[in-house]
């Protein structure tokens, strides 16, 4: 294998490889090449929400790197473990999801993962295959492999114990079940975010318990969201969804905080930061263009860039620019309608009250005209047909009659 490929695999966008670091991974790769046996590289995802965002793509991109080098990429859907709920990063127990919810979310995850992974060679599995059939004796064997003290060494559990917050016994099963997945799949390497270190080590421990060669673990950094502070999350509204329209995606990424731009380039693109312009604004634009072009197409990214510039400068843009603006059909609302209600219906604000707040703050424009009256309303669709509705500098809708 090419030395540069190995260096990229073990270094680019990688937080830690354990045990043994990059040397251990290099040995595994060399042994696999000598034996002409591809490595089995596992990535488990619990479908606990219906959509993927850029934070999820960091580890998916790393899985694709292994896949492109001829190794067996395994995308494991946590159909069973998602019903338990991963306690990682949580100060209290997660609400439990139903099997129907998990199945619905899993379908969406797989559809969106096609944007990153090659499904022609991907092995897709679901841990309900083996976990739903475990009998009590097998579960006791898993529980007996780990002490309560070891579980409390997991930061989240330890903090909750010290705070007197309830820790439920089914939560202890989560890392054990995730670890058993590696046994069932004969994983050689498991990928995950840095917050998954405890769970990845559990996979090694259980593989040894069951007489198998323990996997290597490779972690990737957690992507900080657009607020520049916390991990990217839809609930914190600091995210970029992988299926967002090109204009929204471009507009969000063009506002990436300066301190995050280099990190985003490393984790979300194949571009070298050293070859980029030193101008911070030009870097932001290049980042937005690269990521939007990757998840949509270079042509759509360019149209989004032109449309975003037209919307922000107030030039109105050309017909081609307007075509890049996502549409909202006015047939989906009843007239007369208040502007705040329209903002919610069009997906520009999560709630009517947030729409009112944005109007009062002067963030709402209709065809570049700022509207600050929270009681603003419209009697009929004809008043809005063809108009561009805008909230801030990132969110746009073109209002169409049908």
UniProtKB/Swiss-Prot annotation:
What is the main EC category here?
ligase
- Catalytic activity of the protein: tRNA(Tyr) + L-tyrosine + ATP = L-tyrosyl-tRNA(Tyr) + AMP + diphosphate + H(+)
Pfam families in the record: S4, tRNA-synt_1b
Its Enzyme Commission number?
6.1.1.1
Where is the motif named 'HIGH' region mapped on this chain?
A: 47-56
* Cellular component, GO, one term: cytosol
Biological function: Catalyzes the attachment of tyrosine to tRNA(Tyr) in a two-step reaction: tyrosine is first activated by ATP to form Tyr-AMP and then transferred to the acceptor end of tRNA(Tyr).
What is this protein's record name? Tyrosine--tRNA ligase
What organism is recorded for this protein? Gloeobacter violaceus (strain ATCC 29082 / PCC 7421)
Gene transcribed to yield this protein: tyrS
């Amino acid at each position: 294998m090419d030395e540069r490929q190995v260096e990229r695999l073990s270094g680019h966008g990688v937080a830690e490889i354990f045990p043994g670091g990059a040397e251990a991974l290099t040995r595994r790769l060399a042994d696999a090449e000598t034996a002409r046996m591809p490595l089995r590289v596992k990535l488990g995802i619990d479908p606990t929400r219906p959509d993927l965002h850029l934070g999820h793509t960091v580890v998916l991109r790393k899985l694709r790197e292994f896949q492109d080098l001829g190794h067996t990429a395994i995308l494991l859907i946590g159909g069973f473990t998602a019903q338990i709920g991963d306690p990682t990063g949580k100060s209290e127990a997660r609400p439990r999801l139903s099997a129907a919810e998990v199945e619905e979310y899993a379908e969406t995850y797989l559809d969106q993962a096609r944007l990153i992974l090659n499904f022609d060679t991907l092995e897709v599995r679901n841990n309900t295959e083996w976990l739903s059939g475990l009998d009590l004796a097998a579960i006791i064997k898993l529980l007996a492999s780990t002490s309560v003290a070891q579980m409390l060494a997991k930061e989240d559990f330890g903090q909750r114990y010290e705070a007197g917050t309830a820790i439920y016994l089914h939560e202890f099963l989560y890392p054990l079940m995730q670890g058993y997945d590696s046994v069932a799949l004969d994983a050689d390497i498991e990928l995950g975010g840095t917050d998954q270190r405890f769970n990845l080590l559990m996979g090694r421990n259980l593989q040894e318990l069951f007489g198998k060669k323990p996997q290597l673990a490779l972690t990737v950094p957690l992507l900080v969201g657009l607020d520049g502070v916390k991990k990217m999350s839809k609930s914190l509204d600091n995210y970029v969804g992988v299926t967002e329209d090109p204009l929204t995606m471009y507009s969000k990424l063009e506002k990436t905080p300066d301190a995050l731009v280099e990190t985003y380039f490393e984790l979300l693109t194949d571009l070298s930061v050293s070859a980029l312009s030193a101008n911070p604004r030009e870097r932001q634009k290049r980042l937005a263009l690269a990521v939007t072009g990757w998840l949509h197409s270079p042509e759509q990214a360019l149209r989004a860039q032109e449309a975003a510039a037209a919307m922000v400068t107030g030039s109105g843009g050309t017909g081609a620019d307007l075509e890049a603006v996502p549409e909202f059909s006015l047939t989906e609302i009843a007239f007369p309608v208040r502007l705040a209600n329209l903002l919610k219906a069009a997906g520009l604000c999560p709630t009517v009250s947030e729409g009112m707040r944005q109007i009062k703050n002067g963030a709402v424009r209709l065809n570049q005209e700022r509207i600050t009256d929270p009681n603003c309303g419209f009697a009929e669709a004809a008043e809005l047909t063809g108009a561009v509705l805008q909230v801030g500098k990132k969110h746009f809708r073109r209002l169409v009659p049908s």
